[in-house]
Each structure stands twice: as structure tokens, then as C-alpha cells.
A protein has these predicted regions:
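Hydrophobic pocket/interface hotspot
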Residues: 48, 56-61, 68, 79, ...
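Surface-exposed, charged secondary-structure patches
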Residues: 85-128
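Soluble non-cytosolic domains of exported or imported proteins
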Residues: 35-43, 51-58, 70-80, 127-134
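Short, low-complexity N-terminal intrinsically disordered segments enriched in polar/charged residues
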Residues: 19-54, 62
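Short beta-strand edge/turn micro-motifs at domain boundaries
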Residues: 20-33, 110, 130-156
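Sec-dependent bacterial lipoprotein signal peptides
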Residues: 1-19
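Short solvent-exposed beta->alpha transition segments
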Residues: 42, 61-97, 104
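Solvent-exposed loop/turn segments at secondary-structure junctions
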Residues: 67-69, 117-119, 156
Length: 156
């Protein structure tokens, strides 16, 4: 076994031993605990964007609150069905977005997302191609230390 491989295995073993001894990482990951609420919300919105483009329903829904309810009357179950349908009906989803504008008031926040979306349908007879630009308002609440989406819809 090469010296490099032995060094790598030794380092991994020491890391694992440190974790087993304390039950936690031996050192804090730099920056993680110091993220501002605005950065955490921006991360949530970015992860939803990545989930939409990758067509991963559960990556998107991981950030949606069970208390979700939008102006169209969709609750969590309905938004889950809607997102699932979009993922199945379209072969590719490409989203361009600007940095969101975020306002925080205690345990609640709102963000304006400016975006452009292009999506190609699997069956154009059933679903039209999407070429949409605009802005949406996203409302979030802090729950258990994390920010979750409770509504998104048109600007008011």
C-alpha cells in the first residue's frame, strides 16, 4: 500500500475516532452556524431551484411547510401533486433567476423571486411548452430552526 493511501486511511480513522468519541464532528464546519437568516432563506430558494431543474420532487418539497396554503387554495398535498405533475409532464426545466429580495420579520419572511423558465413538454398535445418570465412572492416561516415555504404566488 502506498504512503499516500496509508496517510489517507490514517486520517480517516482519526476523524472517525473523534466522531465516535464525542458523537459529533470534532470541529465545527466553518460558516455553517454563522449563516444569517437571509443567507438561510436564499439557500432554501436556491435548493428549490436546483430541485426543479433536476426534476427532484422531494428536494423541492423538503422546503415546503406542511402548513402550506396558497391563494389558489392549494395545500401541501395539492402542491405536492402539482410539482409531481410538472416533473412528469416536462422533459427539461431550465430556470434563470436573479438574487431574491428578502425581508425578515421575526419568525416570518417574504422574498421576491425574479425568474425566467423554459420547459419542454413530453407531449405538446397535452401540455404546452413553457416560456415564462416574471416575479413571484414567496412567504416563509421558521419552524424548528429551519425556514420553510408556506406560500408562493403572484406579487401583491
Amino acid at each position: 500500500m502506498s504512503k499516500v493511501m496509508l496517510l489517507a486511511l490514517g486520517t480517516l480513522w482519526l476523524f472517525a475516532a473523534g466522531c465516535a468519541r464525542n458523537g459529533v464532528l470534532p470541529a465545527a464546519i466553518p460558516g455553517l452556524e454563522r449563516m444569517t437568516d437571509e443567507q438561510k432563506i436564499a439557500y432554501v430558494l436556491e435548493d428549490v431551484w436546483r430541485g426543479m431543474e433536476a426534476r427532484r420532487v422531494y428536494q423541492v418539497l423538503a422546503h415546503v411547510s406542511p402548513r402550506y396554503l396558497d391563494q389558489e387554495g392549494r395545500d401541501y398535498t395539492a402542491i405536492q401533486e402539482h410539482v409531481s405533475y410538472i416533473m412528469k409532464a416536462y422533459t427539461s426545466i431550465k430556470i434563470t433567476r436573479m438574487r431574491p429580495k428578502i425581508w425578515i420579520a421575526g419568525e416570518r419572511a417574504r422574498a421576491v423571486e425574479t425568474f425566467g423558465t423554459i420547459a419542454a413538454p413530453r407531449d405538446e398535445r397535452k401540455d404546452p411548452p413553457i416560456n415564462l418570465q416574471g416575479q413571484v412572492m414567496v412567504y416563509l416561516e421558521r419552524a424548528g430552526g429551519t425556514w420553510q415555504i408556506v406560500e408562493w404566488g403572484p406579487l401583491q
